[in-house]
């Protein structure tokens, strides 16, 4: 993983963890296991794709997965709206050279194993590599 991919993911994770501290139990880089896996809702952020557009510009595709045990999906919907606002705020305050506000590319709802329900938000962005 490129150094700035990691830096972007770390900044976004911190922004979501602090901005959603009253709504979620945590933000993770992979699905938690053990006792953490039974405390809902939580967010998992994954890098789906990243590639160089040219020598200076890199494309990053992130999947933000909201995992909940609310079968109606209302909890995930509420959190996803807040995520959009938090990403907009992150874009306006970051010191990284992001070339435009993260774009929501796709949204999917999925029933997971056990009683988990998830909403998957696919965000894309381009940035200048330093």
Cite the ranges covered by each PLM segment.
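Short beta-strand-to-loop capping motifs
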Residues: 66-70, 125-127
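Conserved beta-strand segments that form the floor/walls of ligand-binding pockets within enzyme
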Residues: 44, 65, 122
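Short, conserved charged micro-motifs
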Residues: 71-78
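Short amphipathic alpha-helical coupling segments at ligand-binding clamshell hinges
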Residues: 79-83
